[in-house]
Amino acid sequence: LDRFLMRLSLGYPSRSAEKLLLQQNSRYALISTLKHVFNEQEILAMQQLVNQVHMADAVLEYLLNLADETRKKQHGLSTRGLLALKKAAQAFAFIQQRSFVTPDDVQAVFVAVVAHRIGLSEAETVQLMQQVHIS
């Protein structure tokens, strides 16, 4: 797993959750209360299924066009960033219970995957994405 794949904001915890955190003697005390949702084998199996999500040539071209548009700026999307965008779009399609990626999947993850890589605000990244037409 790549912890730098996306920039996500979880927001602030509720007041009661923050109070509970303040009352703990150790900032790790609550970790022992967490329950896992998937085991290691299930995660690896899902990663394999995500790898099998098909991306048509037209969607690959859309990815390349998006990358080209970012590269008109000072810090364009790297090839590694482009691969991350592809993988995130595949994962999003998988979560939507589809075996193929649509341009909407790419758009759904674009800002979270790309904005922090190219040094633009979320609004600027959305504007950049809207300049690229889907063929």
Where are these regions (language model features)?
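C-terminal engagement/docking regions of AAA+ P-loop ATPases
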Residues: 72-135
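Residue-level marker of positions within ordered structural domains that often coincide
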Residues: 9, 68, 94
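Conserved AAA+ ATPase core "coupling" helix
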Residues: 1-53, 57-65
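A short, mixed-charge helix-start or loop-turn motif at secondary-structure junctions
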Residues: 49, 70-72
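Short alpha-helical scaffolding segments that buttress acidic/His motifs in well-ordered protein cores
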Residues: 22, 63, 67, 106-114
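Surface-exposed beta-strand edges and their flanking turn/coil or helix-capping segments
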Residues: 23, 68, 121-123
